[in-house]
Amino acid sequence: MMLLRAGSLAAHPAARWWILFGLWLVYGSFGLVVVSIAPLVAPIQQELSMSHTAIGSIMGAWQLVYIGAAIPCGMLLDRIGGRLALLLGVALVALSVLGRALAVDYFTFLLAVMVFGLGGPIISSGAPKMVAELFSGSQRGLAMGVYMTGPALGGVIALALTNSWLMPLLDMQWRWVMGVWAVCALLAGVIWMVIAWLYVPAATPVATNAARPSQLATMLELVRMPAVQVLLVMSTGVFLFNHGLNNWLVELLRHGGMSATTAGYWATLPTLVGIVASLVLPRLATPERRFLILGALCIAALLACVLLRFQDPVPLTAGLLVQGLARATLMTVLILTLVELPGIGEARAGVASGMFFSAAEIGGVLGPLGIGVMFDLSGGFDSSLNALAVVASLLALGCVVLKRLANAPQR
């Protein structure tokens, strides 16, 4: 195997697919750990004496850290390159889930989850930056769809195996389940280290300091762009919808009468749909079709909020299907739109992605926390679904505004 030199990534088709595989594994461990709490809410609440509001605050804790860490992590990524940055990111993910296994109360569990907020932005900003460097055109959309199946599959594994297999196998000890996920994250890190050292250059060449603006100047320039402003607001709404339902879906289904194991299986349905959607829709979302697809995904999110309140299998299944369609691809298409906006480009992709996720994770905090608070106040999930339906409607309106701004002539 040949070690690639800086600037030669895109010239070696086989190597870039190996790198994409490494990104897929790293992002898969990210998704695995993100979902790891959802199927274990009941035993964690019981052992650590937590309310729904408390567990909701824990679910949103890493996103709160993420808000402050995303932009610095994007800068770090641009400075040291994806090879080292992504290795650091997956190591922090493994440390976070290991800390959860060792937590003794609310505050130690909260601290362990917050560590994930340091590693998460490195991974979620690094993956689109590397894909933007490696692929172009419709292949870029396909590659983004491929690596986004990683966290989706990680979520399927956590939801499907936790209560049906791992908990019985490990004597119903949720801490040991967290330990298993820590080992999985470490293995993903080792594999990425091997692939990265074989194929990824130590650092991407950059212009001299005299020739390139500061990161702060770049951020200020980007945030003054009206299309970027709208896109950042939309990212908040998308993550509010995604993180809210991702974290509470198993409990929502259990509240409707399912057992923990059955709810875990049903909760995998949106993720399985999302895997297929991630492979198909981003590739179809070329500039001429992108905003039509984005608007349709927002309508799908709205339909999910309406249908998930039913206990009858037919509307419930339909709700889970459209939820999976929306949650798996809304973020991908938005990021694709961001990195291809005039004035962004590959050179600014790291900072732009950091800004995207920093804004988006405001919704990532509000989603899980808000649903937990609303449950404690109302005793159910209907009020939360109503609120998410309003968010989805506003996202659809945002698509119209974003299309007009993105297609406006550049001055």
Predicted stretch roles:
Residues 35, 63-71, 156, 271-279, ...:
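Residue-level signature of mid-helix packing/kink "hotspots" within the transmembrane helices
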Residues 37-38, 227-269, 274-278:
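Extracytoplasmic gate region of multi-pass secondary transporters
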Residues 68-104:
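Conserved MFS/SLC helix-loop-helix module at the cytosolic interface between two early adjacent transmembrane helices
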Residues 79-89, 286-298:
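Cytoplasmic membrane-interface "Motif A"-like loop-to-helix N-cap segments
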Residues 112-150:
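Cytoplasmic helix-loop-helix junction between adjacent transmembrane helices
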Residues 146-197:
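Helix-loop-helix hairpin linking two adjacent transmembrane segments in secondary transporters
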Residues 289-337:
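C-terminal transmembrane helical hairpin of 12-TM major facilitator-type secondary transporters
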Residues 346-378:
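A late C-terminal transmembrane helix in Major Facilitator Superfamily
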